[in-house]
């Protein structure tokens, strides 16, 4: 499987190698439980084949709000706190509402990485021409700490006025831009800063100034407005190396870039804190409309697991065995409906997961 050429998060935002071979698991909401289930089936196949003991701890039973969404209650908070204190990475199912933003703020998960590296075995599922897909290898880096998503919000004047604050402190911008510059220096040495000077003049100016001031290592720096960046990502992603952006822009860019992957169900990401906390999650939403139908694509969740294994547990051997199994099954034409090509065999979530697990089990024990 072709992954982004330098998928790992640079220090200080790398989770590093945990001393304990253990992961925490949060089921998420919507399709989360079903795709996490497949990730666990595949992981257990990898554990059984390799003989590597990995302990799995699940978060407490979900407690729903009245909108059928996860709430960051005390039980969840204690689970995350315990995992992060012990340097245990978390594999997270998709979640929506305010949950993910509150989680990132509470535990200072300031930076989100989303690799965009199209899978060659499903090129026929993409809207883009094959030559553009082959050359595409982009790392999206998004701030999680400020902007509209973390600003004050509410109602005024008896509900006739709604407001949402977009605020950035220079220190917040410096943190994420420093990480992006370091990441670019480890890759092809190119960084695109995405803002919107006309619509958000002061915030855009702060991001531009910060990038120019911090770029002391000679990274090739460029600037692009968010609307154009969305178009370019959706039509010619091969032109980019690393992209960094404010919170909301990064959210939109991540979903737009999924065009190159063939489906949002193939997308994955990771959130890191400066202290080493790591939450690996799909880069797509909870898809409540697909919940319980056994049709969701589990591959993004499996790739999320691979990233966790490789970069937090330092088990690249297990990650590679799962990636090879995914490639084998997709190459055989078995796909969920969202990535089906003209000659594909459309299978269910559980069927695809079972086939990938079987492919893992059929491999020789991985060599570390």
Regions found by a protein language model. Give the residues of each.
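Extreme N-terminal starter segment of soluble prokaryotic enzymes
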Residues: 18-24
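Glycine-rich phosphate/diphosphate-binding loop of Rossmann-like nucleotide-binding domains
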Residues: 24-46, 158-227, 239
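Buried hydrophobic positions in well-ordered alpha/beta secondary-structure cores of metabolic enzymes
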Residues: 29-32, 88, 141, 180, ...
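N-terminal beta-loop-helix "entrance" segment that forms/cooperates
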Residues: 51-77, 233
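N-terminal glycine-rich phosphate/adenylate-binding segment common to multiple enzyme folds
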Residues: 67-163, 248
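Short acidic loop-to-helix transition motifs that present clustered carboxylates
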Residues: 121-123, 224-231
């Amino acid at each position: 499987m072709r992954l982004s050429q330098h998928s790992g998060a640079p220090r200080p935002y790398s989770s590093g190698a945990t001393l304990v071979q253990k992961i925490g698991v949060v089921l998420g909401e919507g399709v989360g439980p079903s795709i996490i289930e497949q990730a666990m089936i595949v992981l257990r196949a990898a554990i059984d084949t390799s003989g590597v003991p990995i302990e799995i701890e699940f978060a407490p039973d979900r407690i729903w709000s009245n909108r059928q969404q996860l709430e960051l209650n005390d039980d969840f908070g204690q689970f995350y706190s315990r995992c992060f204190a012990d340097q245990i990475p978390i594999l997270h199912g998709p979640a929506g509402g305010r949950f993910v933003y509150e989680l990132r703020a509470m535990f200072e998960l300031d930076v989100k990485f989303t690799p965009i590296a199209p899978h060659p075995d499903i090129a026929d599922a993409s809207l883009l021409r094959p030559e553009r897909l082959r050359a595409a290898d982009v790392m999206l880096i998004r701030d999680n700490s400020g902007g509209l998503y973390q600003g004050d919000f509410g109602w005024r004047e008896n509900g006739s006025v709604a407001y949402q604050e977009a605020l950035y402190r220079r220190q917040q911008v410096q943190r994420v831009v420093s990480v992006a510059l370091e990441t670019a220096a480890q890759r092809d040495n190119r960084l695109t800063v995405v803002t919107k000077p006309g619509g958000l003049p002061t915030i855009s100016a702060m991001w531009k100034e910060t990038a120019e001031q911090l770029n002391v290592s000679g990274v090739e720096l460029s600037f692009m407005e968010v609307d154009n960046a969305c178009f370019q990502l959706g039509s010619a992603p091969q032109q980019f190396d690393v992209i960094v952006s404010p919170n909301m822009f990064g959210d939109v860019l991540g979903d737009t870039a999924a065009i190159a992957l063939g489906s949002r169900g193939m997308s994955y990401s990771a959130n890191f804190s400066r202290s080493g906390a790591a939450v690996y999650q799909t880069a797509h939403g909870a898809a409540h409309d697909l919940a319980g139908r056994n049709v969701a694509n589990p591959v993004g969740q499996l790739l999320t697991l691979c990233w966790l294994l490789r970069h937090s547990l330092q088990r690249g051997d297990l990650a590679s065995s799962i990636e090879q199994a995914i490639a084998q099954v997709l190459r055989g034409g078995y796909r969920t409906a969202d990535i089906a090509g003209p000659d594909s065999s459309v299978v269910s979530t559980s069927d695809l997961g079972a086939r990938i697990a079987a492919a893992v089990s059929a491999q020789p024990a991985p060599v570390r």
